Amino acid sequence: MAAAASPEGSPMEAYKQEFIKFMVESNVLKFGDFTLKSGRKSPFFMNAGAYVTGYQLKKLGEYYAHAIHDNFGDDFDVLFGPAYKGIPLSVVTAIAYHDLYGKEVRYCSDRKEAKDHGADKGNLLGAELHDGDRVVMVEDVTTSGKSIDETYPKVTAAANVEIRGLIVSLNRMEVGKGGVTTAQKEIEAKYGFPVASIVSMAEVVEVLHNHEVEGKVVIDDELKARIDAYYEQYGVKE
């Protein structure tokens, strides 16, 4: 099969194509009929909680590390993962980044409830944040920006840090709370840092449409039409 092309027309990186198939093989990205928290009826659903094995977590960290390096380079010191799903994401990505790029980075996460005893009491766990630290935030998927609204004040209150950006695994490419642009663009406008993703839903469709994963076509023409209809209703209008 010829190399897939990105929406911009350039060849899609191999790790992105692998990650898309990896999500399907790990039962993380599903297609069918789903009702989202927002109430929207969606033909696809992503559950990062389905990454449960050592192999899956190892590979997941590598995909995040590749995407972070592509989008932010080595100009960061800390990976911050908002509780709860962001905690293992920040840990496995820190390990993978060291293995792949030889750079030692620290991990940090927030607590849903502050710890009021012991040496590590407070709102954060993992590494301490220091003035001047450059932080990349790590999440599974951003649909509303709610978790960033909760964790951003904790991070900036801990030290005078620079948020280099946020990385998520999948850009759903749907309108956010404002109903005009994506949740990722809303976060960028509100906080002033870039939001990147390993892959976008457009890239997912491009790779999976009429192609097999584990001997089965994942997105056939009928499902493709349903996805197109979903984005006609909820997608961002260019």
Role assignments for model-derived ranges:
Residues M1-V138, T143-E238:
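PRPP-associated nucleotide enzymes
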